[in-house]
Amino acid sequence: MIFLNSMIKKAIFLKAKLQIILKVVSVLTTFKYHLLCDFYEFTMTQGYLKEGFADRICYFDIFFRKAPDGGAFAIFAGLEDILDFVENLHFDAEDLAFLRQKGFDEDFLKYLEHFKFSGEIYSVKEGAVIFANEPVMVIKARAIEAQLLETFLLCTLNHQSLIATKASRIVRAAKGRAVLEFGARRAHGGEAALKGARAAMIGGCLGTSNTLAAKLYGLKTSGTMAHAWVQMFADEYEAFRAFVKLYPKNATLLIDTYDCFLGLENAIRVFKEFGIEKGAVRIDSGNLCELSLKIRKKLDEAGLKECKIIASNSLDEKSIEILLKNGAKIDGFGVGERLITAFSDAIFGCVYKLVAVEIEGEIYPKIKISQDSFKTTIPHFKKLFRVYEGEKALYDELMIYDEVLENLPPNLRREELLSCVFKEGKRLYANKSIETLALFTKAQLSSLDEGLLDAKKTYELRLSPALKSLKKNLSQG
């Protein structure tokens, strides 16, 4: 009987989990992304078909040239959404009818009618620390298949990596204090709010105000009251009292609706009345440093030494760093618009570049040359390694795919960073919980030299002699 009850409980749990997964799929597929391509992807791919290139195997690298905010590195995010997209990408009758109206030939539309991505995708792990000019993802596929992925892949990686990187910067500035994502209302649309909340958790935020994101991605929710709650009552004390009576385990009171210190007095009165020692007060305006010092003093004098002070109000890593340097007594930060929009540097510049083609089984390197030397690409299908001494990352190595590795000194070890995550129409990468991804990112950050965290140092990317020579020769024509 005990065994039967256990099995029933397990079945109920699995059913509930499946329902959540189906709801996520439903929400994320209500809007069709099949045609989320820059128009030239279709003009080029029709041309590939006409010129006999449709089945030519191509290799594309995705990489970025500089990290946001002058940083030394970024956080890789968005892989799961990319694999979902690639696995399900097809073109239905409605898509084909639209393309027909745009003048595309029937032969090309017939090709698209039977489209399914059959290539391979190599990627770093989601949540990984990534550096400029290194391939973070490699697409190996027929020319048409590879080209049609470009826009969605860049759109996804550029947004989610940007937000994860920004969150990581803010979390590091908070020096162990809780950072909560409060940005939904300032995001650039609903999807940006959802994906941004997910990316922020990967970057180290502990919770989100975004209820739908919490439901879809299994995130911790955060949020208690706005000024409207206080204004709804005849006086502030009654507002606080009513709230704590309803939510005694979530007693965070916003004290700056009228006067911060009168609000604090009312909060202390209510906490005492209900015997709450571990509540919190939130301030959303004014001189946060000065206010926090005075609030902390009054809370301590009232015997509420475990009561937390939460601050919000257009915060980012720079303002948080200044607050803490000036001795602010703040226990946690609610960060909204400057996180969810990456306000200080709102562009993440991943690019998608052809680096090789395969003809009759031979791989031929390709290069894009520019008078701006930093825009000249690194050619060929490549492998990427990170070299460690103990648990500390020393440098990365980039080499041609078939090069023989040189032996390292016994105190060093290599880790290959690019692994196959999609092959033969199927994903090989299992989705991971946000908690798992956040812990991985935290471990990645702990492997970095302290100087990289504040961009006082740069991280070395070593090209193998053969790769360096190849790039030089191709650059010179």
Which residues fall in each region the model found?
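Short hydrophobic targeting helices and cationic amphipathic motifs
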Residues: L4-S6, L14
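An N-terminal, globular interaction/scaffold subdomain
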Residues: D84-V86, S123-E126, I130
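Gly/Ser/Thr/Ala-enriched C-terminal appendages of enzymes
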Residues: L22-R56, F60, G70-A74, D300-A302, ...
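Short, positively charged
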Residues: Q101-L109, G189, K366, M399-D402
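Hydrophobic residues within beta-strands of alpha/beta enzymes
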Residues: S222, V281, I309, D331-F333
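N-terminal, Lys/Arg-enriched amphipathic/low-complexity engagement segments
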Residues: C58-E113
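Buried, small/hydrophobic-residue-enriched core segments of structured protein domains
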Residues: L18-R56, K66-P68, G103, L109-S118, ...
